């Protein structure tokens, strides 16, 4: 079952991206390096 998740910037805390994941295949939280427009650089985004 796929669920929608938000990716939150680890440094500024803003929710920048919306994505989906399969909870049965990936039960742990996702951590992805993505571009943060607020800080204008690539930061680690964590599932929230």
Curated annotation (Swiss-Prot):
Keyword list, A-Z: Ribonucleoprotein, Ribosomal protein
Which GO molecular function terms does the record list?
A: structural constituent of ribosome
A Pfam family this chain is assigned to: Ribosomal_L33
PROSITE patterns (UniProt xref): RIBOSOMAL_L33
InterPro entries in alphabetical order = Ribosomal_bL33, Ribosomal_bL33_CS, Ribosomal_bL33_sf, Ribosomal_zn-bd
Keyword Ribosomal protein among record annotations: yes
| GO annotation, biological process | translation
| GO CC annotations on file | cytoplasm; ribonucleoprotein complex; ribosome
The record's annotation in NCBIfam families points to:
PRK00504.1, PRK00595.1, rpmG_bact
Family named by the database record: Belongs to the bacterial ribosomal protein bL33 family.
Q: What is this protein called?
A: Large ribosomal subunit protein bL33A
**Organism of derivation:** Streptococcus agalactiae serotype V (strain ATCC BAA-611 / 2603 V/R)
